[in-house]
Structures are given as C-alpha cells and as structure tokens.
Amino acid sequence: MTQTAQPDTVLIVDFGSQVTQLIARRVREAGVYCEIVPFQSADAGFKRLQPKAVILSGSPASTVDEGSPRAPQIIFDSGVPVFGICYGQQTMCMQLGGKVESGHHREFGRAFLDVNKDCALFEGLWSSGSRHQVWMSHGDRVTALPDGFEVVATSSNAPYAFIADEKRKYYGVQFHPEVVHTPDGAKLIGNFIHNIAGIKGDWSMSAYRAKAVQAIRDQVGDKRVICALSGGVDSSVAALLIHEAVGDQLTCILVDHGLMRKDEAANVVAMFSEHYNLHLLHVDASERFIGELEGVSDPETKRKIIGRLFIETFEEEAKKLGGADFLGQGTLYPDVIESVSFTGGPSVTIKSHHNVGGLPERMNMQLVEPLRELFKDEVRALGKELGLPDSFIGRHPFPGPGLAIRCPGGITREKLEILREADAIYLDEIRKAGLYDAIWQAFAVLLPVQTVGVMGDGRTYEFVCALRAVTSVDGMTADFYHYDMEFLGRAATRIINEVRGINRVVYDVTSKPPGTIEWE
C-alpha cells in the first residue's frame, strides 16, 4: 500500500543514524503521520509527500568530509519548517552558509543545556536561564551560524547547541531529543510539530483503518487473496483488515507445524472461524515438520528446515485452492525502511516475513501489506480498533520456528510435549501472579541435559527445564525479570510435580547483551 500525498505529514530525512526510527516514533506519538526517507531519495520523497514539516536526522558521517550527505535544496526553497538534529543541524548550517568543524572535545552521553534566550519552540517547556539534561553524541560542531540564525542554548562543548531562525522556522539542535535520555525531547518534537508547523495531531487508528480498507479494495478489486495466518498479532491484524475490505475474497491458511504452544492452533482456529467468520484453512503438517526435524540439533539447520517446509506446505495448499492473485502479509514499517549507506548508494534491506519469504515470486502473486506504515505498538492499537481481545493483542512475542528453538539439541515429539506442558504451567503461574503484562517475554526451555533426582522412594533421571523471563522496550536489549523466590519455587514445584520427564528447574538470569532472549 503506497502512502499518497497528505497535507499533515512530516518528512524525516535519514542520514544513516541508528536512532532515526525513534524520531518517527516521537512524531507518531504526537498524533501526526510521518515517513522516513533516505537522503538519496529525499527530493522525490518531498515531492511525493508534500510535507508540512521536515526533520533532518543524525548520522555517523562527518559534514566536513568530502561527499558527505546533504539535504535536497527543495526543502529549504519550500518554506516549510525544518528541525535539524545533530548531523541534521550541521548540514543545515553548512548548506545555508554557516561553518562546521571537527570538535576538539567529542561529546557523548549526558550533558546539560543552558537556555540563554526564549524561543517559540520552548513554549510551555523551557525559559531563559533554565538548565536541562540532554543526550549528546557528536564529534563535529557548528562554529559559525548562517545569516538569520541565533543561539538560544549552549552546552559546555557546544556553543551552538540549540540554534534558531524564528523567521524561517528553522531550528537545529546538537543533542538527540528523540532518545529517552533527553527527558523533554519528545515535548520539544511535539512543540515543533504542533506549535511551529501548525499540524493538529489528528492521525488516529480509526482514520488509518478507513484509509487502509479503501486502499486494499482499490488494489485487490474482485480478485482473490490468500494470507498466511500464524496466530501472531501482525498476521492476525493484517488478515482482519483485509477481510474487512474484501470479505470472502480472502482465504487464510494456518500451517500447524507442531511447534506451537499448548492448544494454540485450536484457539486461533476457534477465534477466527467462530468470532470473525473468516475463511480459515487449518493444515496439520506436524508429522511432516517433526519428521524432518527429528534428531537435528543445529539451530540454524532447524530454522532452514522449518522455513523450507513452510513454503512448500503453503504453496501446495494455495494451489489446491486454485491459487490467488494476491498474498497478504503482516509486514511492519521497520521491515521496509531502507537502511542508509552514507558512503554510497542506498543499501535497501527489505526483510521478508520469516514464514513467507520468496512466496510472492514463486507463486507469481502481488503483495498486500496493509500494516507496512505502522510500528508494532500501532499494530496493537489497530488490533484493538478491529475488536481483537486484549488477551490476544498483549501476548508475548513468539518465534516463527516455535518450540524448535526452545528445545536445544535434537528434537523428538516426546520432548516437545514435555516442553509444551512445562511452558503452559509457567505461563499460567505468571498470569495468576498478575505479572504477565509486566514481562516482555517469558517461556520455558527444555535442556538437552538429564540429572538425577528423587521422587517418592524412587530415583529419577530426567530433563532440566530452564525458565526465562525478560523486560524490554523493543527486544533489542533486555534484562532478566526479577521474580521473588516464592514465585519461582511455586512454578518449579508445579512443573516437577505435573510434568512427567522433568525433575529439575533453573532460572536464567542472563541479560541481553551478552546473551540473546531466545536460547537458539
């Protein structure tokens, strides 16, 4: 689905910063639609979107190097407000006649900003004479301002830390307002959008829903769509949105690989078939998957087998249905943003959904991706708008390869059943304790290790179960969840008493980094 020109849009020009997506998050949180466009195609992006405001991102590049990225001149000729962040501030200054030099003292981490002049961007937030914490990450710095600019705030190593040309509505900051380490950063971005650019902030999920439904109808017409439904939030929301648009022209296929959580496949089928009247084909392919996986211990080999078998199974079932012209996917915005190489051309790394990668080309289908403009939290909000229950929307992430990567070593049907039961008990205890929503992800792992135990009067030699729970904002970094010992004791006792095949339970206290959230 292609975003057409809309009056209240913010264009974010990406110069390759690792935190550009955070800028987009802050703009969306302010109720305003935005798009990230790499600097190489920013000229075309500006003409396509006709934005009400532009934000220039940071970059690992240096403005003083020959051939470093620049913003297209059309931005400065257009008269729209511009907000330059870090590198964005520096290139704006250079392009408008100022100077930038490599800093004598690099500034990374927390810094303090001294406000020495009132500014329209500070309204209701900062005032002259106040001091505020910000987050710096720069080596270069502005040393001479273009005509029309003035300094409104400084830091110890950045005499031009916050600059403004109030007449042209150009603002530049040396720090990063988009990160949480700048406490007032989101409000500054909000002030720029609402007060300076005059954008109302009325972009909502209900408005997006109506626009997306119409776009799907325009794209699909009277043709057929098939959608791979995994039971996850992304594919489920995409399927419901497509179904709302084209009704019975959509058929969903749930490939049950035998690696799902306890009763998960049955619950997904019941919810979508009974409550949403969605045409859903449930394919039990567990014998096929587990048969090929049995005895395979290398995690990457497991993933490849699962991916290959999924494509083969999905393709076979789709052909039985007579094929379709369109394939529905739950692709999200972070998956389609182009990564930027500031030393050459754009490096486009569009990820394929782990389950359906390669399918559109193999089956000669066009993609329908109604979520490709949304972040994960926005997809959850849209799911709520579509009527999905909170218990479903708020589910913890679950990997595509399923329990196969939570069973290190060789896989057998027996080990999967042991793990499935232990995992269900663990999650049940978490819900009973009221902890589910406080945890990003929690699951059990069945280790390829057996230990001696004593149950009753008998000796046992059974598997070890590891419990994992982490807190996180985005899954990129994570900390282990700090349970009290009473909870862990209760969960361990239930698992050992109720699951035949486990006689020892341990808790994983590894953070990410150095570990990963999943064990494989």
From Swiss-Prot:
Q: What class of enzyme is it?
A: ligase
Q: Name one Pfam family in it.
A: GMP_synt_C
The metabolic or biological pathway listed in the UniProt record of this protein is: Purine metabolism; GMP biosynthesis; GMP from XMP (L-Gln route): step 1/1
One Gene Ontology cellular component annotation? Answer: cytosol
Please indicate if the UniProt record lists ATP-binding as a keyword: yes
Residues in Glutamine amidotransferase type-1 domain copies: 9-202
- Which intervals hold domain GMPS ATP-PPase? 203-395
Task: Supply one GO molecular-function term.
Answer: ATP binding
User: Catalysed reaction per UniProt?
Assistant: XMP + L-glutamine + ATP + H2O = GMP + L-glutamate + AMP + diphosphate + 2 H(+)
InterPro entries (UniProt xref): Class_I_gatase-like, GATASE, GMP_synth_C, GMP_synth_GATase, GMP_synthase, GMPS_ATP_PPase_dom, Rossmann-like_a/b/a_fold
Q: What is its EC number?
A: 6.3.5.2
Q: Which CDD domains match?
A: GATase1_GMP_Synthase, GMP_synthase_C
What's this chain's function?
Catalyzes the synthesis of GMP from XMP.
Q: PANTHER family in the record, alphabetically?
A: GMP SYNTHASE [GLUTAMINE-HYDROLYZING], GMP SYNTHASE-RELATED
According to the record's subunit comment, the protein's assembly and interactions are: Homodimer.
Q: Report the protein name in the record.
A: GMP synthase [glutamine-hydrolyzing]
The species this protein belongs to is Rhizobium rhizogenes (strain K84 / ATCC BAA-868)
Q: What gene name is listed for this protein?
A: guaA
